[in-house]
Curated annotation (Swiss-Prot):
One MF term in the entry's GO annotations: 2-polyprenyl-6-hydroxyphenol methylase activity
Gene: ubiG
Stored CDD domains: AdoMet_MTases (cd02440)
Family per record: Belongs to the methyltransferase superfamily. UbiG/COQ3 family.
Organism of origin: Azorhizobium caulinodans (strain ATCC 43989 / DSM 5975 / JCM 20966 / LMG 6465 / NBRC 14845 / NCIMB 13405 / ORS 571)
UniProt cross-references to HAMAP family, sorted A to Z: UbiG (MF_00472)
Protein name (database record): Ubiquinone biosynthesis O-methyltransferase
Annotated function: O-methyltransferase that catalyzes the 2 O-methylation steps in the ubiquinone biosynthetic pathway.
Catalytic function, reaction form: a 3-demethylubiquinol + S-adenosyl-L-methionine = a ubiquinol + S-adenosyl-L-homocysteine + H(+); a 3-(all-trans-polyprenyl)benzene-1,2-diol + S-adenosyl-L-methionine = a 2-methoxy-6-(all-trans-polyprenyl)phenol + S-adenosyl-L-homocysteine + H(+)
């Protein structure tokens, strides 16, 4: 896919993630923090979608029949397991190296995912439509959050849903997500995040509203040091999810 002139991508961010290459699927490599939170992300997304679309949570393929777009899919850590749950998955990423890794891993695993190298804007321009649009750990890396959400929102079906996860802009997030994660614990490469690009839940809700969505759910994701694992919580000071529905959506019945 060809990059558009008005793309919301930040070239420096694309280059940084493109350089990760095969490390995407190494649970002990540079993407270890993403592997740590991935089960929680998947569980949250699955639960939200099952409730919204009235699917059977006990099914081995609870997302069957749903067309889902994973924006900024990276190496496919989210797309691939969602496809295993029955979703008709499309993953898009502007970094060509990410798509090569994602497609190779999916092929080896025998999982069908439609990976595309390009931007959300290009998919929107092509008239693509989805039941679900996901932008997890993405908006803190784009050049224009408002434009990104508007273009992503164009692709959500009237009864669909958009899920965004990102980092709050607080003193706590600076201490934990940047100083702690990048400089002290070295969970992430230095420079992975910029605190000034973090966005508060209120700001994100406003941008979602401008894109034609109303917030239906807000949840935090925190690390439990006693259990050594991540979990969903009410605390949105650092990591959080915002779920949005088209403002004029109709009932699923």
């Amino acid at each position: 896919m060809r990059m558009t002139a008005n793309a919301t991508i930040d070239p420096s961010e694309v280059a940084r993630f493109d350089a990760l290459g095969a490390q995407w699927w190494d649970p002990k490599g540079k993407m270890a923090p993403l592997h740590a939170i991935n089960p929680v992300r998947l569980g949250f997304v699955r639960d939200v979608l099952v409730r919204h679309f009235g699917h059977d949570a006990r099914s081995l393929r609870p997302l069957k029949g749903l067309r889902i777009l994973d924006i900024g899919c990276g190496g496919g850590l989210l797309s691939e397991p969602l496809a295993r749950m029955g979703a008709d998955m499309v993953g898009v990423d502007p970094a060509p190296g990410n798509i090569v890794v994602a497609q190779s891993h999916a092929d080896e695993a025998g999982v069908r995912v439609d990976y595309r190298q390009g931007t959300a804007e290009e998919l929107a321009d092509a008239g693509e439509r989805f039941d679900v649009v996901l932008a997890l750990e993405v908006v803190e890396h784009v050049a224009d959050v408002g434009l990104f959400l508007r273009r992503a929102g164009e692709m959500v079906n009237p009864n669909g849903i958009m899920i965004v996860s990102t980092l709050n802009r607080t003193v706590k997030s600076f201490a934990l997500a940047i100083v702690g994660a990048e400089y002290v614990l070295r969970w992430l490469p230095r420079g992975t995040h910029r605190w000034d690009k973090f966005i508060t839940p209120a700001e994100l809700e406003a941008e979602m509203g401008a894109a034609g969505f109303e917030m239906s759910e807000l949840a935090g994701m925190v690390f439990d040091p006693l259990r050594g694992e991540w979990k969903i919580a009410a605390d949105t000071d650092v990591n959080y999810f915002l779920v949005g529905k088209p403002a004029f959506h109709t009932s699923e019945g």
